[in-house]
From Swiss-Prot:
This is Probable lysophospholipase 2. PROSITE patterns: PLA2C. Residues 1-19 form the signal peptide. GO terms for biological process: glycerophospholipid catabolic process. Its EC number is 3.1.1.5. InterPro entries: Acyl_Trfase/lysoPLipase, LysoPLipase_cat_dom. Residues 53-600 form the PLA2c domain. Catalyzes the release of fatty acids from lysophospholipids. Keywords: Glycoprotein, Hydrolase, Lipid degradation, Lipid metabolism, Secreted, Signal. It catalyses: a 1-acyl-sn-glycero-3-phosphocholine + H2O = sn-glycerol 3-phosphocholine + a fatty acid + H(+). Disulfide bonds: none annotated. GO terms for cellular component: cytosol; endoplasmic reticulum; external side of plasma membrane; extracellular region; fungal-type cell wall. Glycans are attached at residues 44, 96, 141, 178, 221, 245, 253, 281, 286, 316, 319, 373, 393, 449, 501, 558, 579, 596.
Amino acid sequence: MYFQSFYFLALLLATAVYGQVASPELHSLSRRNWKKPPPFPSTNASYAPVIRSCDSSEIMVNSLPRGELPDLENDFIEKRLSNANEALTTFLQSKNTTADLDLSSIVGDNGPRLGIAVSGGGWRSMLFGGGALAALDSRSNETTLGGLLQSAHYITGADGGSWLLSSLAVNEFRTIQNISKSIWYTRLGIFFIEETHFGDLKNYYTNVVDEVNQKAAAGFNVSLTDYWGRAIARHFVGQLRGGPNLTYSSVQNASWFQTAEYPYPLIVTQGLTGGLPDGSNGTATNSSIYEISPYYLTSFDNNVRSYTPTQYLGTNYSNGTAVDGKCVTQFDNVGFLVGTSSTRYNEALIDVSLRQSRMSRRLGFTLRHMRINGSSVSFYPNPYTDATDIAGNATAVSEDIVDTPYLDLFDGGYDGQNIPIWPLLQPERKLDVVFAFDSSGDTSNFWPNGSSLVATYERVTQRASDAVYDVEDFVHVPTPETFVNLGLNANPTFFGCDGRNTTRGDVPVDHNTPPLVVYMPNTPWTMKSNLVDHRYRIANSEIQALIQNGFVATTQDNSTDFASCLACAVVQRSLERRNQSTSAACQQCFSQYCWNGTVDNTPVDDDSKNPTYNPAVKTSSASGVHANILLSFFVLLATLLVTA
């Protein structure tokens, strides 16, 4: 134990040897070869990115003209349309509110298009979101909402939401029931070594540090995010030691991705240019928002409005071409990317390490030193360096970005937009409805209060004259006080049911009209599901109970009436674009679930010892698993025993 402790400390404090990994092979970067996916991870599981020779004349950074999508994303969505339309038609035919519609004219290339956004919130979000996706999955038993996952075109995730979507993406989009029992594992916590842990045996700390040192030794700057990413990946990837060489771009090889069988996955993060604000990891609401797919790192914001292949992240570019003909692969490690989207846990990682064993306390002191030296964000070699005029075409990349060597990327929810809905508002994606699953810990006892939607609303309505984004409109939403006082955060709520009553004004509905938002908050249907943000150990039985709570909350205890009303929300924009009236049945649904504009801004006392908002468990039983309060009690007792 003591030998291991000193060895681990020595590893952390050792000076990294910086070098360059050379490869004699010529790695073609032509646009044709972008379509050739990177290989699956090999058994040589090194975390170090690989430097290869490549053609320095190839353009690898492309501007994104307004009205267009990145080329391979567009190809994916074109392929996705037929799969999604077939699933959506089946869903709508089964609901009494939409079965009588002429679905052949409503469902098609012109819509409806669906998006899913899973909020941040650590394990709380991953497990509630997992239950929600299970509820939307046609492969799940006893769900009234089955088929909506198969109908969706996009899925976004930030923080814990990115853990969820990445876990699905790298594991062939297996069912939540399967993946939660075979891969998700939290009982030992994230930085603990009491038992055998995913092939680490008793060398957990040593392995994590060795892996990060491999990256440093290859000549790349490392940060707290590298350690955090290596730790969290062990809990959702399903590969030995969390897949040290598993890349996000390798998802292109997955059969589900090649056939576009499930939604296009986007990890959402934010960029800070010009360094961190003094004493803060936050950002202004007009900072750049980046999204990472298996194909591209993209930003639609006007100060970037460009995209570059995910496969070659880490490459040093100058004006869109690789410097000295050297390209980097394997920088886009899945753990590193989702760690980037959840960097707020970097600070918690330090705190946990300082509170644990003597060995982990030493880890904490070392990581805290990294924080003091400015390594609390994630370092991405800037692909937009000097990218002012690529191939004779002027770019939109701003001077403060082209002049910096690194993109400082960090948590996708730091500006308050904890529901990663922004990428789904881009007019180019033509989405009609967004399911927004909110597991934010807004209140003192970690329940959502709508603040995430309010932050997006303010980003749009308080748009400065020099705003860096094109999204100009959003649905109207009330204050967090109204969310709580009217119970909008305790039940599903539809926002923007009338497409002519958004921030865009009373104008005809078209694809520039913001999508209707179906707000689905984390609520205690079968158990108290308000896990604290920095809880790291969860019993396997509690994982299943939390997933079941998300399932029941999403289906409203398998309510057929709610499922029929959700069908109304899905087709609403398509009907409005055609000037078709809403049916009487759907009007009744909207009167029940749509926010009608009522406000109640009475201050909400958020005393953590006696909070005003402290919802009770709604039901003692649920369809499918028949979870009950007694089970929750035993799960809690078991968790306390494990964590004692």
